Design a protein with these regions (language model features):
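Short, glycine-biased loop/turn motifs at secondary-structure junctions and
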Residues: 1-228
């Protein structure tokens, strides 16, 4: 399907096509933004990214359309999808959050996160406390006078997304794990959409941050699909 990817869900392709709807068409499924062929966790993440992370349809299409072929074969077992939820959380904490912190000239705090081990099912009860302590440094360490005016509120967005992802991941157990996995995916999507609404700053700065975020997001999806 060679057409622009658009915002939101649609009744049919004549109205428009988002990333997940394009996947349903590519897979030969009924037209839907919840195709069976796509991993539940990645589908939850990318539905929100499709709608929040882009300034225009051209950017959305350029970044997301190359992912379609790999996504339509990403449906997997519960264990694999849980592993992907862990990856989304770790990417938010160890990639997106440090990027946001360095934007605010908080490199020392970024290094604190980068020195922490990735969260796993085996260590989450102990290591999540270390992440929460590091998040507290952000909450109390941001000086309004030091924040570039055009980035106001963006670090707060990533901070809240990271905090929410940890909370949801720590509760991802039992028969209702998908509810928490979906919350992880939504939090990660918000973190990866942190600069999409900023149109007040230096265009070159905003463009650089946005393209850097897109590159990380594409890498994240490719790594997630590779988990089998």
């Amino acid at each position: 399907m060679n057409r622009l990817l658009t915002f939101g869900s649609h009744k049919n392709a004549d109205e428009g096509v988002c990333l997940l709807e394009a996947c349903s068409v590519r897979a030969g499924e009924p037209f839907s933004d919840r195709p069976d062929s796509v991993c539940f966790v990645l589908s939850s993440f990318l539905r929100k990214v499709n709608d929040l992370a882009f300034f225009d349809d051209e950017s959305r299409t350029r970044v997301l359309s190359p992912l379609i072929d790999s996504l339509v074969s990403s449906s997997a077992s519960d264990d694999v999808q849980k592993a992907r939820a862990y990856l989304l959380t770790n990417s938010t904490l160890l990639e997106m959050l440090p990027l946001a912190l360095r934007t605010y000239s908080m490199s020392n705090t970024a290094e604190v996160f980068e020195a922490l081990p990735p969260l796993t099912p085996e260590n989450i009860e102990t290591v999540s406390g270390q992440y929460k302590a590091a998040l507290a440094q952000i909450k109390h360490g941001v000086s309004v006078d030091e924040v570039p005016p055009h980035l106001g509120g963006l670090l707060t967005l990533v901070y809240r997304a990271a905090k929410g992802a940890i909370k949801a991941l720590s509760q991802m157990n039992g028969s209702l794990w998908k509810y928490q996995a979906e919350e992880v995916a939504l939090c990660a999507a918000h973190a990866y959409s942190w600069v999409s609404d900023d149109d007040e700053g230096d265009p070159d700065v905003v463009r650089g941050l946005t393209e850097g975020t897109y590159s990380l997001m594409v890498s994240l999806v490719n790594r997630a699909v590779a988990i089998r």
